[in-house]
């Protein structure tokens, strides 16, 4: 007569254990799939945060950046000027080009040629050597204060609005009288929040800007100390 080895688990117990593992694995797969879907759907919104615009503000500030970015930001700011929402446009520019040309002069000619002399006469330039959004905000604060402008619409690329908004509100905090900042985002072809994973350029922008956002959220200015940039107004 054959005897069953008492060390071997009962067959029903093995089946129950296998079924339990399958359920656990299935739940893990479902959770991961749901998380991935939510990430792809809403991941682009991490970078974008715009504000409802006021009926009127003193100035629309165009932040510096890539050629495509500046062109789109300039169009957005000029549109606000034409709509009567702002009285002036302030563009952040370096003093000279690589070839020694005066950037304010070249930029004024650009505005006059593309938007007309009436628009060009309403554009002022904040001239400063900056290499980060943090430095740029500090320089532009000086230019804004020199004009007495406190109601400010900051025009930048859509993917830059959340990070730039946090930087600007920190840079202009404790001013007396206080600044009122509104963030306006424009599409420059580098990023769209919806379907951001479908194009290589959008993914590159998302990775770069998200890493900056995370870094500045954790470390602020980082382990180094930035030298404040001096901004001066040229019209």
Question: For each predicted feature, which ranges?
Answer:
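N-terminal type II signal-anchor transmembrane helix
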Residues: 7-51
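A structural signal for short, hydrophobic/glycine-enriched beta-strand patches
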Residues: 42-198
């Amino acid at each position: 007569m054959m005897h069953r080895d008492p060390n071997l688990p009962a067959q029903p117990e093995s089946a129950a254990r296998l079924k339990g593992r399958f359920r656990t694995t299935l739940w893990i797969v479902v959770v991961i799939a749901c998380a991935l879907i939510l990430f792809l759907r809403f991941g682009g919104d991490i970078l974008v945060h715009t504000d409802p615009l006021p009926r009127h503000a003193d100035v629309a500030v165009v932040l510096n950046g890539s050629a495509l970015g500046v062109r789109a930001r300039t169009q957005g700011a000029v549109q606000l000027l034409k709509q009567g929402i702002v009285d002036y446009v302030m563009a952040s520019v370096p003093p000279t080009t690589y070839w020694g040309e005066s950037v304010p002069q070249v930029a004024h000619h650009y505005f006059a040629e593309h938007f007309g002399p009436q628009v060009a006469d309403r554009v002022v330039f904040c001239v400063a050597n900056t290499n980060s959004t943090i430095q740029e905000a500090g320089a532009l604060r000086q230019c804004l204060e020199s004009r007495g402008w406190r109601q400010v619409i900051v025009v930048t690329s859509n993917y830059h609005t959340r990070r730039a908004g946090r930087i600007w509100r920190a840079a202009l905090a404790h001013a007396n009288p206080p600044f009122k900042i509104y963030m306006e985002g424009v599409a420059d072809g580098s990023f769209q929040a919806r379907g951001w994973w479908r194009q290589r350029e959008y993914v590159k922008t998302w990775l770069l800007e998200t890493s900056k956002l995370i870094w500045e959220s954790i470390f602020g200015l980082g382990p180094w100390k930035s030298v404040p940039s001096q901004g001066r107004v040229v019209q």
